[in-house]
Amino acid sequence: MKAVVQRVTRASVTVGGEQISAIGRGICVLLGISLEDTQKELEHMVRKILNLRVFEDESGKHWSKSVMDKQYEILCVSQFTLQCVLKGNKPDFHLAMPTEQAEGFYNSFLEQLRKTYRPELIKDGKFGAYMQVHIQNDGPVTIELESPAPGTATSDPKQLSKLEKQQQRKEKTRAKGPSESSKERNTPRKEDRSASSGAEGDVSSEREP
């Protein structure tokens, strides 16, 4: 799932010359649903959008407050073209979820937003319609979000934390320099005449993950 989040002073959606929804200060979210998206990706994206800190706090400090913190509005628009793959110069959308399935999924996304936040502050366009989306970007500030691919290690928070700790340990090991065991291996040893001959090799004490 992909989303383009824009901080706005106002935004609106028009269909057939008629304005169907509008917001004031807040964020406009263009959402692209992929074939492989599940409830897990949906919940991940809802959390990211609602907690993304793109607003300043009362003291003027930037990137300190989320749309929920500020109690601002959200305008959501389904945008299957975010799942575009170029074939030469021609856009291809085979990675986007089919329309019939995507509509229900998109409605579930809106429902989850409204359940987590204030429902009266969540607005949306018209799924499947030809729309004119008017966005007054504030800044401009535009953030791209993407949920972890289903089935990858990074989609599991516990696994992600484990991988991060492993990487930190590796970095600490490199910073300390050669380990004692490595120093011992590199120290010349007296030849043992009674030992059988054979090929010698260096085996690293650090395993690749």
From Swiss-Prot:
A motif (Gly-cisPro motif, important for rejection of L-amino acids) lies at residues 139-140. It catalyses: glycyl-tRNA(Ala) + H2O = tRNA(Ala) + glycine + H(+); a D-aminoacyl-tRNA + H2O = a tRNA + a D-alpha-amino acid + H(+). Pfam families: Tyr_Deacylase (PF02580). Mg(2+) binds at residues 4, 6, 28. Residues 159-170, 181-194 have a biased composition (Basic and acidic residues). The modification Phosphoserine is found at residues 197, 204-205. InterPro entries: Daa-tRNA_deacyls_DTD (IPR003732), DTD-like_sf (IPR023509). GO terms for biological process: DNA replication; tRNA metabolic process. One of its GO terms (molecular function) is D-tyrosyl-tRNA(Tyr) deacylase activity. Expressed in many adult and fetal tissues. Highest levels in testis, ovary, spleen and in adult and fetal brain. Its main location: nucleus. Transmembrane segments: none annotated. Its EC number is 3.1.1.96. Belongs to the DTD family. A Gly-cisPro motif from one monomer fits into the active site of the other monomer to allow specific chiral rejection of L-amino acids. Possible ATPase involved in DNA replication, may facilitate loading of CDC45 onto pre-replication complexes. An aminoacyl-tRNA editing enzyme that deacylates mischarged D-aminoacyl-tRNAs. Also deacylates mischarged glycyl-tRNA(Ala), protecting cells against glycine mischarging by AlaRS. Acts via tRNA-based rather than protein-based catalysis; rejects L-amino acids rather than detecting D-amino acids in the active site. By recycling D-aminoacyl-tRNA to D-amino acids and free tRNA molecules, this enzyme counteracts the toxicity associated with the formation of D-aminoacyl-tRNA entities in vivo and helps enforce protein L-homochirality. This is D-aminoacyl-tRNA deacylase 1. It comes from Homo sapiens. The gene is DTD1.
